Amino acid sequence: MVGSKMAATASIRERQTVALKRMLNFNVPHVKNSTGEPVWKVLIYDRFGQDIISPLLSVKELRDMGITLHLLLHSDRDPIPDVPAVYFVMPTEENIDRLCQDLRNQLYESYYLNFISAISRSKLEDIANAALAASAVTQVAKVFDQYLNFITLEDDMFVLCNQNKELVSYRAINRPDITDTEMETVMDTIVDSLFCFFVTLGAVPIIRCSRGTAAEMVAVKLDKKLRENLRDARNSLFTGDPLGTGQFSFQRPLLVLVDRNIDLATPLHHTWTYQALVHDVLDFHLNRVNLEESTGVENSPAGARPKRKNKKSYDLTPVDKFWQKHKGSPFPEVAESVQQELESYRAQEDEVKRLKSIMGLEGEDEGAISMLSDNTAKLTSAVSSLPELLEKKRLIDLHTNVATAVLEHIKARKLDVYFEYEEKIMSKTTLDKSLLDVISDPDAGTPEDKMRLFLIYYISAQQAPSEVDLEQYKKALTDAGCNLSPLQYIKQWKAFAKMASTPASYGNTTTKPMGLLSRVMNTGSQFVMEGVKNLVLKQQNLPVTRILDNLMEMKSNPETDDYRYFDPKMLRSNDSSVPRNKSPFQEAIVFVVGGGNYIEYQNLVDYIKAKQGKHILYGCSEIFNATQFIKQLSQLGQK
């Protein structure tokens, strides 16, 4: 988890991984050092199950667990009658029908049925009836509710879902024509996942939320669901700790539920840190980045089809030390570090080559023999470090490719200029260039970049621009090729938000330019960064971080003083906005209803670094980049 890691704690990533390994081991705890071959089995999952497993377990890890084959539930599958099958699926009507069909077709030797979320009694009866009809009752070995309906992306970050994410999207929650029944479904979906999250975490939180928002609806429902489960002592999911490592053994965690509407500028912001940039400008999804490799300009014969670009995928995982160290670093630092890693690798590689050539010398002359004995030990250590060296080379190549792809976007779209300008707008610093000039500059950014910038200006302005000014801006945006639908929605949102409360403030300036980057980089660098500003970040809390800080540290602040307070462990649910507990919290989960982003996540990570012994987890109903968010705003603006 973020913050200093205590020996006894297990991150949500570790907990969900342990739960998955136990499930793949037929729901028996998986022992690392157990001797003997694992039992070979097939894994059958739906898309939900696939999305939960893929960021946590590699194909090799699955094979080590005895999974020889992993197949989608709704794909065409041949019978493998002598092998047990582990199912990991959502308990939907469609999935249950297919599962019953598998039983009827007698596809496998035995069936271990694991449901991502709790299965209803009636659906369980459907399976029992199908098993009876197919004479397969004895083959259904186990049926389990796993409560794993969320996706862990980092030790300290999770999202609710990836499939059907439009169901819980910002657009879905903020649609003006949403019916009460539809809203109930959205809220129930979010609450089910949050409930699974707390079951896996093994803790009952104290809940705080803002009033009159979707976050409040989630809080009320989650409080009720936790309360009901705790009351049923025999079946309560919070009595034992399956891992035996109390994450929150001494103190319960705080859950802060915030609504995306408290801050619409951050998700549109151009960013400057590595992970957030990768998510903003590349195709980065469930910890995997997909790059199109340019195949170079080749003269195709006339009339021939143009060559297709190769797609290459890279997994950016916790095992990748470079990624772990630099995902939160400003981009110029990343480029410099890749270059340094490359140089140190080349030096090591040269050493291995040199030693190898010495070993190949004729053993006649004395010089060679004495050198040989000196170097045997060196060579042994060099050869033993060869796998490590090759892994280092793989990571360097990976990050060279990813960072180069990011840099191409920065240079082509002047993203450093946008980032710096937006930071000034958000922190109310004097602007050195008029907004109209930036929008009208044909060389600066795509129409979407310009739209993002203008929306941030519009959202952050204490006073909305006059109609005359607004028309001028709209004309410049239209001339630049922008679609004005997102602005339509933001205008309505701002008018409504103004009635409700004051706009979010973003603190003081957070960047200081350090001169042009070309001075920082070595002349021999892979990264030609001329003209790109070397902007250095200064820690400044974003609205979500500020709200968390107020509630975690029990600070009195007009922004959070009227937040509702729920304690599912209290016998009667009397909502008191005054917390009983006056001591600050050590652990907290911030959950954004309506979608989150890596900028906010990174801001929380940086905030907690200074807090000794405290931990934060960041969660959101979906994680979107600015392009995806603008699309949702655009759809809302067209209504």
From Swiss-Prot:
Provide this UniProt record's keywords sorted from A to Z: Cytoplasm, Endoplasmic reticulum, ER-Golgi transport, Golgi apparatus, Membrane, Phosphoprotein, Protein transport, Transport
Q: Summarize the protein's role.
A: Plays a role in SNARE-pin assembly and Golgi-to-ER retrograde transport via its interaction with COG4. Involved in vesicular transport between the endoplasmic reticulum and the Golgi.
Q: Which Pfam families match?
A: Sec1 (PF00995)
Q: Which SUPFAM superfamilies match?
A: Sec1/munc18-like (SM) proteins
Any single GO BP term: regulation of protein transport
InterPro entries referenced in this protein's UniProt entry, alphabetically: Sec-1-like_dom1 (IPR043154), Sec-1-like_dom3a (IPR043127), Sec1-like (IPR001619), Sec1-like_dom2 (IPR027482), Sec1-like_sf (IPR036045)
Spell out the subcellular localization from the entry.
Cytoplasm; Endoplasmic reticulum membrane; Golgi apparatus, Golgi stack membrane
Report the source organism: Mus musculus
Q: Which Gene3D superfamilies match?
A: 1.25.40.60, 3.40.50.1910, 3.40.50.2060, Syntaxin Binding Protein 1, Chain A, domain 2
For the modification Phosphoserine, the affected residues are: S34, S300, S525
GO annotation, cellular component aspect: cis-Golgi network; endoplasmic reticulum membrane; Golgi cisterna membrane
Membrane topology qualifier:
Peripheral membrane protein
The name under which this protein is listed is Sec1 family domain-containing protein 1
What is the predominant subcellular site recorded for this chain?
A: cytoplasm
Whom does it interact with, and what assembly results? Interacts with STX17. Interacts with STX5A. Interacts with the COG complex via COG4.
Q: Which family does it belong to?
A: Belongs to the STXBP/unc-18/SEC1 family.
